[in-house]
């Protein structure tokens, strides 16, 4: 992308920021004083998100700044619980994910923690014990990484700053961003927007809640798996000859959504349209993220759509989400699609049934791996 295009998107981003502020969606940036305590253990949780206006491609990889803002809703297809321990004299961070050392998340965590330590002048290391709880076995495109990023970030904030700052979702979202861009939005309940664009003040590169959970919208997902990495999609997208025009459309859509106070019916339409455009962008770069199974489901949905207002969307994976104000439409569709299906709800207390066992498990792990 050339300098003139980047300058244009910075200008468009500044206008979006001003609009959000004028409409009362931006909250004040709070500063907190770190108070890390050696051996302190903190625990937090998060649920994943599903995007209406999506993002692909980082303008600033080092600081995890996307080329465009993105909008999503919280879902309950899974959840993540994370425990964090501070080691004042430690030299090496550790990450245990689902019972094993995970090199991918260790690299992401180290990047974020180095950034965090430098910003707040903190020495020492952090140990994370993380577990994901899924309502499915194996799938791609259900935003697990967003829940992991948000849970880890909130546990870290609680450990270093205390309970109060850990309740500041905007503050938490800034550091979730460093693990996963979508993690910014998973730091919030309801519907949220991640304000991100070229040249943004990094203090404001965070997510902001813009609406409650849309309880009058029914939703669910057909989980499907592919081994395509999200990072591959990011790198392919920015090379597409259609990428800049896609971004222009997104800025125009987001401007309209702000003007209409993030009307849920418009968000449903945006989610479907943007999913199709995202797949076209990746296809133009030679990356096909849908599978034969997901294409069959999409065809069935398209054939069924003439029966009423049923919408679909997907992110960087073949798992297809359906949404409607009319639950009977989804139930009728499912009669013609026999694939495994997860019904979404607005029950965001599922984690409580596992919290005690997780806490015991994490404490036992930390006890076995004592701070020297």
UniProtKB/Swiss-Prot annotation:
Top-level EC class: lyase
Alphabetical list of Gene3D superfamilies matching this protein: 3.30.230.10, GHMP kinase, C-terminal domain (3.30.70.890)
Pfam families on file: MVD-like_N
Catalysed reactions listed for this entry: (R)-3,5-bisphosphomevalonate + H(+) = isopentenyl phosphate + phosphate + CO2
GO function term, MF aspect, one: carboxy-lyase activity
Alphabetic keyword roster: Isoprene biosynthesis, Lipid biosynthesis, Lipid metabolism, Lyase
Enzyme Commission code(s) on record: 4.1.1.110
InterPro entries: GHMP_kinase_C_sf (IPR036554), Mev_decarb (IPR005935), MVD-like_N (IPR053859), MVD_Decarboxylase (IPR053464), Ribosomal_Su5_D2-typ_SF (IPR020568), Ribsml_uS5_D2-typ_fold_subgr (IPR014721)
Pathway info: Isoprenoid biosynthesis; isopentenyl diphosphate biosynthesis via mevalonate pathway
Key word Isomerase present: no
One GO process term, biological-process aspect: isopentenyl diphosphate biosynthetic process, mevalonate pathway
Assembly mode: Homodimer.
Recorded family membership: Belongs to the mevalonate 3,5-bisphosphate decarboxylase family.
Protein's job: Catalyzes the ATP-independent decarboxylation of (R)-mevalonate 3,5-bisphosphate to isopentenyl phosphate. Functions in an alternative mevalonate pathway, only present in extreme acidophiles of the Thermoplasmatales order, which passes through mevalonate 3-phosphate rather than mevalonate 5-phosphate.
Extra information: It is proposed that Thermoplasmatales adapted the classical archaeal mevalonate pathway by replacing mevalonate 5-phosphate decarboxylase (MMD) with two specialized enzymes (mevalonate-3-phosphate 5-kinase and mevalonate 3,5-bisphosphate decarboxylase) in order to produce isoprenoids in extremely acidic environments. It was found that at low pH, the dual function enzyme MMD is unable to carry out the first phosphorylation step, yet retains its ability to perform decarboxylation.
Protein name: Mevalonate 3,5-bisphosphate decarboxylase
Source species of the chain: Thermoplasma volcanium (strain ATCC 51530 / DSM 4299 / JCM 9571 / NBRC 15438 / GSS1)
Lineage of the species this protein comes from: Archaea, Methanobacteriati, Thermoplasmatota, Thermoplasmata, Thermoplasmatales
């Amino acid at each position: 992308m050339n300098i003139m295009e980047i300058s244009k998107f910075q200008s468009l981003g500044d206008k979006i920021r001003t609009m959000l502020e004028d409409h009362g969606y931006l909250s004040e940036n709070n500063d907190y004083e770190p108070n890390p305590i050696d051996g302190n253990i903190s625990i937090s949780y998060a649920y994943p998100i599903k995007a209406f206006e999506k993002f692909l491609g980082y303008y600033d990889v080092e600081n995890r700044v996307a080329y465009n803002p993105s909008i999503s809703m919280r879902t309950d297809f899974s959840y993540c619980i994370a425990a964090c321990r501070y080691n004042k004299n430690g030299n090496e961070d550790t990450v245990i994910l689902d019972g094993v050392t995970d090199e991918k998340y260790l690299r992401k965590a180290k990047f974020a923690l180095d950034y965090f330590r430098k910003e707040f002048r903190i020495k020492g290391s952090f140990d994370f014990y993380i577990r994901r709880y899924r309502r499915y076995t194996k799938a791609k495109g259900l935003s697990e990484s967003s829940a992991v990023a948000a849970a880890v970030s909130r546990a870290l904030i609680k450990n270093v700053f205390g309970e109060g700052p850990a309740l500041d979702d905007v503050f938490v979202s800034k550091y979730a961003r460093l693990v996963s861009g979508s993690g910014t939005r998973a730091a919030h309940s309801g519907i949220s927007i991640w304000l991100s664009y070229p040249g943004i003040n990094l203090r404001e590169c965070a997510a902001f809640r813009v609406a409650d959970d849309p309880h009058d919208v029914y939703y669910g997902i057909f989980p499907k798996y592919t081994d395509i990495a999200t990072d591959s999609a990011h790198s392919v997208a920015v090379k597409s000859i259609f990428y800049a025009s896609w971004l222009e459309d997104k800025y125009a859509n987001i401007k309209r959504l702000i003007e209409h106070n993030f009307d849920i019916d418009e968000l449903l339409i945006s989610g479907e349209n943007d999913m199709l455009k995202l797949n076209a962008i990746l296809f133009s770069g030679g990356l096909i993220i849908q599978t034969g199974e997901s294409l069959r489901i999409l065809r069935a949905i398209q054939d069924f759509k003439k029966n009423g207002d049923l919408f679909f969307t997907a992110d960087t994976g073949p798992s297809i989400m359906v949404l409607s104000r009319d639950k009977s439409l989804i139930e009728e569709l499912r009669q013609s699609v026999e694939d495994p299906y997860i019904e979404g709800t607005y029950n965001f207390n599922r984690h409580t049934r596992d919290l005690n066992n997780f806490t015991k498990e994490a404490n036992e792990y930390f006890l076995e791996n004592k701070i020297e």
